[in-house]
């Protein structure tokens, strides 16, 4: 069984942390992954930096720009991940835009993911129809779970279709804005979470965008299996460096 599916069966609320590969320094990728697992994170999303990250807010955009300046590329990320499965056991997901994957070669990319122990992909600009028609068989051949995003504007019909072609979890975006721009969840967002819950999907949902602390983590996981934090974690690194990523995780999970 894929590590993502195994993790989703665990009887607790899940925390996923996103960070940008090659940030703040080129060599930080492996250290951050290892430290996050030690601190009790359930999933890790490794951001593949891209020059035009449309869905990302300013914090993640800046980290992506810096990572590219540091020399991070798709090939170099796979080099860094070569021995990672000797050091960590939790699910690892690469999150990135489709252009670098196309440039690398989609099948070559999937093959490298399998070789390095990547469990899934989140590709915000890969439409579900295109995935279903052209890439689903290929991704599944290499054991990869492709995670799709839904927003408050996604219709019930579309959500059901996404659910039908998914075999991991559904990324439930808390708003239609960019990452890192929300503070707490209003009535409209809660109504959207409830609407998705009422659809009784086969794939669990994990909430992303606007999760930054224990309060927002708890709010999100009232309606979902887990929550994803990106911008707030990168801000923590900006302010505190990479020497104590565990302190951030402990605050979110309210561990003492």
UniProtKB/Swiss-Prot annotation:
GO cellular component: cytosol
Catalytic activity line of the entry: (1S,2R)-1-C-(indol-3-yl)glycerol 3-phosphate + L-serine = D-glyceraldehyde 3-phosphate + L-tryptophan + H2O
PANTHER family with a match to the protein in the record: TRYPTOPHAN SYNTHASE ALPHA CHAIN, CHLOROPLASTIC (PTHR43406:SF1), TRYPTOPHAN SYNTHASE, ALPHA CHAIN (PTHR43406)
SUPFAM superfamilies, alphabetized: Ribulose-phoshate binding barrel
Key words, A-Z: Amino-acid biosynthesis, Aromatic amino acid biosynthesis, Lyase, Tryptophan biosynthesis
Enzyme class, first EC level, given as a word: lyase
Protein's name according to its UniProt entry: Tryptophan synthase alpha chain
Source taxon at top rank: Bacteria
Keyword Lyase (UniProt): yes
Protein purpose: The alpha subunit is responsible for the aldol cleavage of indoleglycerol phosphate to indole and glyceraldehyde 3-phosphate.
Signal peptide start-end: none
Enzyme Commission number: 4.2.1.20
Metabolic or biological pathway, per its Swiss-Prot or TrEMBL entry: Amino-acid biosynthesis; L-tryptophan biosynthesis; L-tryptophan from chorismate: step 5/5
Quaternary structure and interacting proteins, as annotated: Tetramer of two alpha and two beta chains.
Protein family (similarity comment): Belongs to the TrpA family.
A GO molecular-function annotation: tryptophan synthase activity
This protein's record includes keyword Lyase: yes
């Amino acid at each position: 069984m894929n590590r993502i599916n195994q993790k989703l069966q665990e009887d607790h609320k899940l925390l996923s942390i996103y960070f940008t590969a090659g940030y703040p320094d080129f060599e930080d990728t492996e250290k951050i992954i290892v430290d996050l697992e030690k601190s009790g994170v359930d999933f890790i999303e490794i951001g593949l930096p891209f020059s035009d990250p449309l869905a990302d807010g300013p914090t993640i955009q800046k980290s992506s720009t810096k990572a590219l300046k540091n020399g991070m590329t798709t090939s170099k990320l796979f080099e860094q991940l070569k021995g990672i499965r000797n050091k960590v056991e939790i699910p690892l997901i690469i999150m990135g835009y489709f252009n670098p994957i196309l440039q690398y070669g989609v099948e070559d990319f999937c093959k490298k993911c399998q070789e390095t122990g990547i469990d899934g992909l989140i590709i915000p600009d890969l439409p579900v129809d295109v995935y279903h028609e052209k890439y689903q068989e290929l991704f599944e051949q290499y054991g990869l779970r492709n995670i799709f995003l839904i927003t408050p504007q996604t219709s019930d019909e579309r959500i059901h279709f996404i659910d039908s072609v998914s075999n991991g979890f559904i990324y439930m975006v808390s708003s239609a804005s960019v990452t890192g721009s929300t503070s707490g969840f209003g009535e409209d967002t809660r109504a959207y979470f409830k609407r998705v819950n009422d659809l009784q999907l086969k794939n669990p949902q994990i909430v992303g965008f606007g999760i930054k602390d224990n309060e927002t983590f708890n709010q999100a996981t009232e309606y979902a299996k887990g929550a994803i934090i990106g911008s707030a974690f990168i801000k923590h690194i900006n302010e505190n460096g990479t020497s104590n990523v565990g302190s951030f995780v402990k605050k979110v999970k309210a561990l003492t």
